[in-house]
Every structure is written in C-alpha cells, then in structure tokens.
Curated annotation (Swiss-Prot):
Family affiliation: Belongs to the RpoE family.
Keywords carried by this UniProt record: DNA-directed RNA polymerase, Nucleotidyltransferase, Transcription, Transferase
Function in brief: Participates in both the initiation and recycling phases of transcription. In the presence of the delta subunit, RNAP displays an increased specificity of transcription, a decreased affinity for nucleic acids, and an increased efficiency of RNA synthesis because of enhanced recycling.
Compositionally biased region (Acidic residues): 120-172, 181-195
Species this protein is from: Leuconostoc mesenteroides subsp. mesenteroides (strain ATCC 8293 / DSM 20343 / BCRC 11652 / CCM 1803 / JCM 6124 / NCDO 523 / NBRC 100496 / NCIMB 8023 / NCTC 12954 / NRRL B-1118 / 37Y)
Protein name from the UniProt record: Probable DNA-directed RNA polymerase subunit delta
Record note on quaternary structure: RNAP is composed of a core of 2 alpha, a beta and a beta' subunits. The core is associated with a delta subunit and one of several sigma factors.
Region described as Disordered: 120-195
One Gene Ontology CC term in the entry: DNA-directed RNA polymerase complex
Amino acid sequence: MSLTTLGNHPKEEFALVEIATAILTEHKEAMPFSSLVQEIQEFLEVDAETFKSRLSQFYTDLNTDGSFISLGNNEWALRAWYPVDAIDESIHELDDEEDAPKRKKSAKKKVNVFADNASDDDVIDYNDDDPEDEDFGTVTDDDTETDDEETEVEVESDDESNEIDLSDDESIDANMTELSGGDDLDDLSDGDQEK
C-alpha cells in the first residue's frame, strides 16, 4: 500500500498506523519516529496542534501493532523486512556498539569499616560522640529540674445542687419510667408481677 493508493479514499478515514505503513513501504528503509510523524502530518494536511492530540495514541499503536519494529534510537521499520534471526542480530549489534566504548574501571580498594585499626580514616568509631551534639552543649541536672512540690488545686463544690434526695423514691421511679418509655421490664421490686 503506497501513498498514491491511499489517495483514493478520504484521508480522515485512515488510521495513522496504516498511513505509517504506506510511508515506510514507499521509502523502503527504517525512519526516525520524528520524520515518520512529520510525513504523516503532511499527508493528512493538518496543523501541528491538531496532530499533537493524536500523537500519543499513534505511538502506542506503533508499539502494539505487530507490523512495526523498533530498531533502537527511536527508528522504526516494517517487521516484514526482517526475518526473525536478523531482528535478533540487529538488536544485538546495537547493544554491542553501545558496550564497545566503555573503559574498564580500576578495582576498588576494599575497606573493613569495622576494623580496630584507629589510624584508618574509613573506620567508623561508634563510641565517638556526634560532633553536632557539641553545638547544643551538655545537659545538666539543673536544666532538667522539675517541680517536686505538689500543687494543690481548690475545687469549690456546690453540695446542694449536685446531691439527689434519695428519700423520694417515687419521684425517681416516675422519672425513670418517663425516661424508659413507661415499660418496666426488669424491675419487679415495685410491685409488678411477672406475666
């Protein structure tokens, strides 16, 4: 399918993946994603802002569609161009190119940080005080004194207003009956009989 074949139908009806397939088929080589997007945008004759809203979905479709393959460095090609063995080799070639310029690192000196040798600067001495603690000074017993004397608080009580007259049982029972809804279910001491 080429761009000329796509020209027979309205451009809006085509999926971006179909247009990308036609563009890659016409170019017959892998293309960077940005170039592919630019050509699709030119084919659809839309401005950048309109196309930008569809860009993330297009990239997702490009990844999930089985007919495209990423060759690294954001270059895309048609999977049909590469047999399965060649795909694996081309990907490993890219990995080998990235690995080649690395230099060997010199071996690091191992240090036992718990050693008893006090002359070594790398040894951690857990018995030393933290130097930041010295900024605040030492705490003495005078600074932490608390009042050992108990403070008495006088509470005035109004005995008459808080006391209940226990001699008037009938008024208490009437109030209790009023609060409980009138049914005396569990108290048989007031003369009620069990039914």
